[in-house]
Amino acid sequence: MERKKTPRLANLINHYMKRLIVFIIAAFPLFAVAQSTNAPLNEDYYHWIDRYEIKAGRLAPELFTTIKPYQRKAIVAYADSLQKKDQVFSSRSDQFNYEYLRNDSWEWSRAATSNSEKPFLKYFYKKKSDLLRVDEPEFDLHVSPVLYAGLGKDSNLNDPIYINLRGVEIRGMIDKKIGFYTFLGENQSILPSYVQNGLADNPVVPHELFWKKFKDNGVDFFQARAYIDFNVTKHINMQFGQDRTFIGNGYRSLIFSDFAPPSLFLRANVKIWKINYLFQLNRVAADVNATTGGSGQGPYPIKYIAFHHASINIGKKFNLGLFESVVFDADSSSHFDASYLNPVIFYRAIEQQFGSTDNVLVGADFKWNAVKRLSFYGQFVLDEFVLDQIKSGDGWWANKFAVQGGLKYIDVAGIDNLDLQLEANVVRPFTYSHNSDYGNYSNYRQPMAHPLGANFNELIAIVRYQPLPRLNMVAKGFYAKKGLDAGVTENQGGDILKNNSTRISDYGNTIGQGVQNKIMYIDLTASYMLKHNFFIDGKLILRDSKSDLPAYNTNTSITSIALRWNIAQRGYEF
């Protein structure tokens, strides 16, 4: 049944958020201290940082690696501390990576190696990482071009696939107290065949917001991410803007991933002693008006996600975190409670107190750097749970949970820069779903957690090798079993966008139920860094999907080559 929209509440929330933000910005000069913008999310970049923490054999006091992105200042401080104490940068490749991290955030390292030997036309690229830069006591500015030009062949398409992205990245500081970041990119792309096929069922471009059709089978979309950043005190950092968040130490996240599009957020992070506490409020799209021809005109219905995560370092090797997240309706005044805006409270208690029907997820995560070169990690997400129903073994539909376990093994068999990661993910049917678009765990019709949604098992293996300082080789693969719906009216619990009140049965639900879909995905990539942050990539992708549903019974091979400049690799790994 369609809910009557009452935008008063959404306007009220926006009103108070704006007043809070204006107050903070107006007041910050009274107490703000030096701060730092983030290093953009990039699995290759972040792997180096995680690698050195594992190699050191103890947790990084400067970083709580479960919360991503990391701040540039913290990255440099941690890298410098390792260079002085642990000698973890022992190989040529590790020493290159250390210098890369310092050069990429030279405003914090002041590394002599960040200077270009021959600036372009005297004024450009005085620093290896920046086209233009301003380095004054009251103003710091970094401007870099962004390019992603890729061309490939998909075995199921006659025409080539490609990506053509042009953009700019800007970051800086004002008075060393307030930071700012902006990324803008214009894209035209012909997507892989299996991604194009998915648009028929869910007409949104993975990772993106508004899009339109380009030529016969392409897509055109604009990317924009931006935020302001400042430290309220030495230990409290705040950010406001539009970007992504990743929670976890795995390749996937079952809590908060970077798969969905960026969203408007207000974030407060407290890091003190051995404790890190994050509160974040996100505004996301509950649904969109889209067809295979592109996104329709808004405005779209809005919902909010209030999220907090607390973690503590126990000893020098073990980190334990607890989280709670509530998805609530911003277009109805019937069941919103302003207590959701309280950054230090248990949302489940609010539900019990006021009888709320909002969707609350709770759970835990951990990381254990057991010995040098070996780390274990995991996540547990509880969407709904009744112990007696679990004990009965009757497959009650509302026993909704997700589990992740993994390990990272650094310098495998004593071979420098050969790293292995293994991971398993299990998600029960109907997890992340709700009886309303305003309660499911999604943004712009895309999962906020795992890209496969729910009702699946998955195994992942990743091997990374850096035989030469500028050469990175990655072999990545996953095998997943997911239960699909036989038709649009059926609901086996794998599509988190479907109303879970339309479930096929209250009992007898098992992981992978419905029409079974087996996916084998292999990605072999070699990347060579020609200049700082300028890469040439060669890639081979093999994807085999077996199902009784013809649309999902496909075999795809893709070969491609790309030039990347100041941007992470783009993937459709599902």
Regions of interest found by a model, annotated:
Residues M1-T37:
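Bacterial Sec-dependent N-terminal signal peptides
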Residues F31-A32, Q239-R244, I522-L524:
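An exposure/low-complexity boundary signal
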Residues S36-E53:
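Short N-terminal segments immediately surrounding and downstream of signal-peptide cleavage
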Residues E43, R58-T66, Q71-K73, Y78-N319, ...:
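Outer-membrane beta-barrel channel domains
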Residues I49, I236-D243, V381, D537:
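Active-site-adjacent bridging/hinge elements
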Residues I49, R225, I460:
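Generic structural marker for isolated residues within well-ordered, non-membrane alpha-helices
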Residues F221, N313, F318-F574:
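Exposed, low-structure sequence patches enriched in small/polar residues
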